[in-house]
Curated annotation (Swiss-Prot):
Residues 319-417 are annotated as: Interaction with SMAD7. Residues 292-306, 331-347 have a biased composition (Acidic residues). Interacts with PPP1CA. Interacts with EIF2S1. Interacts with PCNA. Interacts with LYN and KMT2A/MLL1. Interacts with PPP1R1A and SMARCB1. Interacts with SMAD7. Interacts with BAG1. Interacts with NOX4. Residues 22-39 dip into the membrane without crossing it. Sequence repeats lie at residues 279-318, 319-357, 358-375. Residues 101-122, 158-314, 330-353, 368-393, 532-578 are annotated as: Disordered. Residues 443-490 are annotated as: Interaction with SMARCB1. Residues 1-21, 40-578 are cytoplasmic. The gene is Ppp1r15a. Residues 560-570 have a biased composition (Pro residues). This is Protein phosphatase 1 regulatory subunit 15A. Belongs to the PPP1R15 family. It is a peripheral membrane protein. InterPro entries: PPP1R15, Prot_Pase1_reg-su15A/B_C. It comes from Rattus norvegicus.
Length: 578
């Protein structure tokens, strides 16, 4: 592991307070504070900090470069420090501590200012000496997940940290004049990147750049637009650092000493996306513009990454789905009935997705099979080879496409017949035909029957009845079959027999009374009935014989009374004897 630039026993205030990363409000306040306290804002305490850093660089040019080892004994560390360096660093720390910082404002400072000891002043000065030109290492949970930019002023053992992303090199104070000019040119290129539409890239803090940056701050405030008014501290690394702390190689550091800013710019690798984090988890969740608009093809992922503009919009991997998926424009094409050649060409071109299963070929419905008109007289004629080939080619066509191959005729239009009085009725419609599949099955069944007697033509045959009668017994359930065969006629038969029996009994009893002799005697008796007596003095007429009978008057309609009911002649109607 590479040594840390600051003591390991000191915890950063962001590490001590883990809820800083979990609270969106704290993150928002931190970004706002970093933006307000950026290098472009003309604050008094920031100007003093920059001036102190410049003084440190000027003093360091007169002294040999510090040793890159961070964990030195206290005796060597105290012995190597110079009074000029310690004095400038102490003045810088005191000036920064005098101002208010975000950790102090929020109450997140972990180190109390009263915890310092007088004997540790030399150690603090040496820490400032080592951290002046070294990159600031962020906490482990902040390196990939949340990279807060801007100046972070933390009161940790009296050390002031600048959060500018620094280059991967050490020994910055011992730099040549040519390197200084290269740094200035790279800084001018980075300053020009604040224009609108610029994508953030890696920004490098190089010693000797503070003077040029301080002069640019005044001119940039007046020229920058709203999109370019953001602080340069927001420019952060757009890619993950490929090298971890334990994989840092000294050869790469030496190569970066000559041109530190150019190496940082070369690491960009061209224009990168505007949002990129150092964690794979954030890469999966960070929104990148254009991700939701790219069309991906499941069947060919490699070709979709290379050229997504020429891929199919609705890919389907199944041949069965390809056959049934609706494609716009297929049913809107106008087809000419007389142009069979063009229809066959279209059918051959559209037959690109054959069914892979024999089961689907047998059961999948193809439009046009039931509308094909076949002549009954041509059933025996052989089928041409060309027609067979064209039919085989159209068997694989899509169901939605309307092909005219293999002699398929257009279905007849809907017919309506109007019968008007006094006009000749329309001819009868043709009988509906079976679908093509059923016609083929019937043809296969009728084929052996036609070949039984080939000498006799079809139209010359006569109907012959066989003398041998075959009786087929129908096996049915007794209960339901008998109940169905009975019906109401059985009840009618019972009633009819009952009524006939009653009629016979009545005729047997009334038969003697209906004879002509009995009828004559009855009329005679009715004719000889006595009239009612008006008075008692009138003599009663004697009964006359049948020869003396006179025609019966029409007034007498009552039958003759029985002999027992005839009153005696001497009995008066009034109940008195005469």
């Amino acid at each position: 592991m590479a040594p840390s630039p600051r003591p390991q026993h000191v915890l950063h205030w962001k590490e001590a307070h883990s809820f800083y990363l979990l609270s969106p409000l704290m993150g928002f306040l931190s970004r706002a504070w970093s933006r307000l306290r950026g290098p472009e804002v003309s604050e008094a305490w920031l100007a003093e900090t920059v001036a102190g850093a410049n003084q440190i660089e000027a003093d360091a040019l007169l002294t040999p470069p510090p040793v890159s080892e961070n964990h030195l004994p206290l005796r060597e560390t105290e012995g190597n420090g110079t009074p000029e360096w310690s004095k400038a660093a102490q003045r810088l720390c005191l000036d920064v501590e005098a101002q208010s910082s975000p950790p102090k404002t929020w109450g997140l400072s972990d180190i109390d200012e009263h915890n310092g000891k007088p004997g540790q002043d030399g150690l603090r000065e040496q820490e400032v000496e080592h951290t002046a030109g070294l990159p600031t290492l962020q906490p482990l949970h902040l390196q990939g997940a949340d990279k807060k930019v801007g100046e972070v002023v933390a009161r940790e053992e009296g050390v002031s940290e600048l959060a500018y992303p620094t280059s991967h090199w050490e020994g910055g104070p011992a730099e040549d004049e040519e390197d200084t000019e290269t740094v200035k040119k790279a800084h001018q290129a980075s300053a020009a990147s604040i224009a609108p539409g610029y994508k953030p890239s890696t920004s490098v803090y190089c010693p000797g750049e503070a003077e040029h940056r301080a002069t640019e701050e005044k001119g940039t405030d007046n020229k920058a637009e709203p999109s370019g008014s953001h602080s340069r501290v927001w420019e952060y690394h757009t890619r993950e650092r490929p090298k971890q702390e334990g994989e840092t190689k000294p050869e790469q550091h030496r190569a970066g000493q000559s041109h530190p800013c150019q190496n940082a710019e070369a690491e960009e690798g061209g224009p990168e996306t505007s949002v990129c984090s150092g964690s794979a988890f954030l890469k999966a969740w960070v929104y990148r513009p254009g991700e939701d608009t790219e069309e991906e093809e499941d069947s060919d992922l490699d070709s979709a990454e290379e050229d997504t503009a020429h891929t199919c919009t609705t890919p389907h991997t199944s041949a069965f789905l390809k056959a049934w998926v609706y494609r716009p424009g297929e049913d809107t094409e106008e087809e000419d009935d007389g142009d069979w050649d063009s229809a066959e060409e279209d059918a051959s071109q559209s037959c690109t997705t054959p069914h892979t299963s024999a089961f689907l070929k047998a059961w999948v419905y193809r439009p046009g099979e039931d509308t094909e008109e076949e002549d009954d007289s041509e059933n025996v004629a052989p089928v041409d080879s060309e027609t067979v080939d064209s039919c085989q080619s159209t068997q694989h066509c899509l169901p939605v496409e309307k092909t005219k191959g293999c002699g398929e005729a257009e279905p007849p239009p809907f017919q309506v017949a109007f019968y008007l009085p006094g006009q000749k009725p329309a001819p009868p419609w043709a009988a509906p035909k079976l679908p093509l599949r059923l016609q083929k099955r019937l043809r296969s069944f009728k084929a052996p029957a036609r070949n039984q007697d080939p000498e006799i033509p079809l139209k010359g045959r006569k109907v012959h009845f066989s003398e041998k009668v075959t009786v087929h017994f129908l096996a049915v359930w007794a209960g339901p079959a008998q109940a169905a065969r009975r019906g109401p006629w059985e009840q009618f038969a019972r009633d009819r027999s009952r009524f006939a029996r009653r009629i016979a009994q009545a005729e047997e009893q009334l038969g003697p009374y209906l004879t002509p002799a009995f009828r004559a005697r009855a009329w005679t008796r009715l004719r000889n009935l006595p009239l009612p007596l008006s008075s008692s003095s009138l003599p009663l007429p004697e009964p006359c014989s049948s020869t003396e009978a006179t025609p019966l008057s029409q007034d007498v309609t009552t039958p003759s009374p029985l002999p027992s009911e005839i009153p005696p002649p001497s009995l008066d109607l009034g109940g008195r004897r005469g």
